[in-house]
Amino acid sequence: MRYKWVISLTVVASVCQAADFKIEVNEPRQTIHHFGASDAWSMQFIGLWDNEAEQEKIADWLFSLENDAQGKPKGIGLSIWRFNLGAGSAEQGKKSKINPGTRTECFLTKNGSYDWNKQPGQRKFLQMAKQRGVPYFLAFLNSAPVYFTQNGLATNTGRGGTINLKDDCYDDFARFMATAVKGIEEHDGIHFDYICPVNEPDGHWNWLGPKQEGSPATNREIARLVRETSKAFIKQGLTTKILVDESSDLRCLLATHQTSWERGYQIRTFFSKDSTNTYLGNLPNVPRQMVGHSYWTNTPVPYMREIREQLRDTIAKYGLKFWQTELCIMGNDEEIGGGGGYDFSMKTALYVARVIHHDLVFADAESWSWWRAVGEDYKDGLIRVYTSDRMKSGYAVDSRLMWALGNFSRFIRPGATRYVVSSSAEFDPYGVMCSAYRNADGRWVAVVINYSQSVQPFSLSISDGQKYEWQMYRTSDVSGETLKPVGKTAGKQQLPPRSITTFISD
């Protein structure tokens, strides 16, 4: 009841008076390293299409930093691309017990040799990303290669909550990751800056076998695997950083959630020296940071801020950094009808923009990534693809969701610093939200979300008194407003309803 009272009060305030926002130049926060998305699972198919024009269109939407003749961005300029390093379920076919659309190939073969012709569709998009200037690449795995797993599969099939990896294969799995990363660099010229050996090891779906690749793991199993991976990468002379642990839920980083102590309290488990069995802070290629996913923690809306502030404070306590590496719409996101059925409109775009704002402003996330770059009839893709022949061919349609991410990713570039923004109004997650950044070239960027159904008066200024002319780029449901340049301003504007506007200083 208390939350409802606060919300109603702030909505009234935002309607009745202008929202004055000031960038506080003496209050820098975190460095922003990148914004991204993953190639799972569509790119393995799209990268093999005969229609190269469609591939180029998708790549431009995701990666391009160019503008058209009218000054409108051609794409959203993602700065990190997540590559799903496969486990071999595709070679198993129906015996994999995994849906055809989510199986993956593996570079490692049954006889122990490596086939560098595998995963060609995904590797084509690695090249297309690099050609368009994407500076960072991350490899992630959902399962060990099937030759190393306890059940011979890349899915868990309800076998329990421990890692699906033979006890004598930890070093083999680590060696595979190092060899695959080195091989892709040698064959394709793609350097992986980061690798995540496990993905959502605390997710209860991983225990059941969800008809996609995945494996649970306890904290001790993760620590053992990361130590082996660290040794394998050092032995092969690789500079790739090893990340932990792509948690399925922010609550698992802080405490236990729908699981036991063996999978909870991950921040202190991996980065407190008191955790002698699981401490990873002494490994030279494991950065002091936690990587997690923002699923399940976005409702009720007041809780979204609360859990992220708890995360920020705990991360700071242990001297760490935080990256958010996956999000899509799930069943509990009831405000926009859950994940089923694709949505091209601002309804989903604004909902996700609000989550991005919370992750950057209240959790101090230094990196932010969406889940799938391309999907079908579910709210998990930035781009919607249509196919009638099981992804052998098709065509793609962009969404307001993709362009809304672009309001951040296209303009906030690697190395930017976020700054505190003060306001004359109370924070209102149903009204106007503003976050501000300064790129390495000195230009200011402010991303302003108007979540409300009405026009909102807005004023932007800087605490040092400097005056700027701001170029504005807007995404809304208005036809053609997808990162559209909509003019310049000295700082005072009427924000259209249900819109996102990025302000760039001159």
Label each PLM-derived region with a short phrase.
Residues 425-468, 498:
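Carbohydrate-binding surface patches
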Residues 33-39, 79-85, 136-140, 193-197, ...:
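Structural recognition of the beta-strand scaffold that forms the well-ordered cores
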Residues 182, 212-355:
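Noncatalytic carbohydrate-binding groove/subsite architecture in carbohydrate-active enzymes
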Residues 463-480:
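Solvent-exposed beta-hairpin/edge-strand motifs
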Residues 21-192, 205, 212-223, 227, ...:
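N-terminal catalytic cores of secreted or lumenal carbohydrate-active enzymes
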Residues 484-506:
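C-terminal beta-strand-rich structural cap/linker in extracellular carbohydrate-active enzymes
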